[in-house]
C-alpha cells in the first residue's frame, strides 16, 4: 500500500435516508425474531459526513458530539473502529457530521451513517474490501446497515438479512416526523400485531397495494402518528416506514409533494425527497473512484 497516494484532504459523503415501501410480518422464529418481507428504497435527502483520512494516527474523532450519545455508542465511531479491527489498519480519520435526519424515525439515520463511514474509509484507507465484506461488518452494527452499504434498493426477507436488488418506481415523497419516540420492541411484542401475513413473490407484491403490518399497532399506541397519517391520507397514499415514527405520502411530482408540505404547520418536522434505487452514496463513491483510482 502506497500511503503517499492516500487522500488526506476533506471528502464529502452523503448519508441518505431510506423508506420501507411495504413491510409484512410473515412469522416468528423460536428465538423470538420475526420473519418479514420488506422493500427498501433510498431517497435523495439525508445527513452529510465530511471525512478526512489521517495516516499519522489511528485515532477516530467525530464532531460535533450527538447530545445524549456517548462516543463508544455512536454508530459512526463503531463503524470506523470495526473497520480498523477487521483490517488491522493503523490509519485514523476525522469525521464531521451534518445531521438533518431525525433520530428514531424509522428512516435509517444511524444505520446510514455507519454504512457511509464503512464505504468512505474503505476507499480513503485503500482497503479494497468488497461490498460483501463491508456488509458483513455492517450487519454486526445493525440489521439495516448492509442495505446502505450495498447501495441498491432491495427486497429483504428472513429477519431482514436476505437481500435481493429491486427496482420500484422512483416516486416523490413527503416524509413527516411526528414528535414521538417509538420503542420497536413494544411494537414487535404487541399481542395484536399481525404475524401471519402470507409470503408472496416480489413480483406479486410490487403489483399490489403496499401495506405496513406495524402501522395498525403504532397508530393505536401513538395518537400523534395516527393524526399525521390521517392528515396525509387526505392528499395521497400514505404509510408508516419501519416501526416509525416517520410517515410518508407518495406523489408523482415534486410540485405536488411541495404543495402539501406548504400546508403543514411550521412546528411539524418534514421534508420532500425523491425515491432513488441507486443510493447517492454509491454515486459519490463512483465519482471519487474515477477521480482517485486505487492504483496501489
UniProtKB/Swiss-Prot annotation:
It catalyses: 4-CDP-2-C-methyl-D-erythritol + ATP = 4-CDP-2-C-methyl-D-erythritol 2-phosphate + ADP + H(+). The active site is at 18, 144. Keywords: ATP-binding, Isoprene biosynthesis, Kinase, Nucleotide-binding, Transferase. ATP binds at residues 102-112. Its EC number is 2.7.1.148. This is 4-diphosphocytidyl-2-C-methyl-D-erythritol kinase. One of its GO terms (biological process) is terpenoid biosynthetic process. InterPro entries: GHMP_kinase_C_dom, GHMP_kinase_C_sf, GHMP_kinase_N_dom, IspE, Ribosomal_Su5_D2-typ_SF, Ribsml_uS5_D2-typ_fold_subgr. Catalyzes the phosphorylation of the position 2 hydroxy group of 4-diphosphocytidyl-2C-methyl-D-erythritol. It comes from Vibrio atlanticus (strain LGP32) (Vibrio splendidus (strain Mel32)). Pathway: Isoprenoid biosynthesis; isopentenyl diphosphate biosynthesis via DXP pathway; isopentenyl diphosphate from 1-deoxy-D-xylulose 5-phosphate: step 3/6. Belongs to the GHMP kinase family. IspE subfamily.
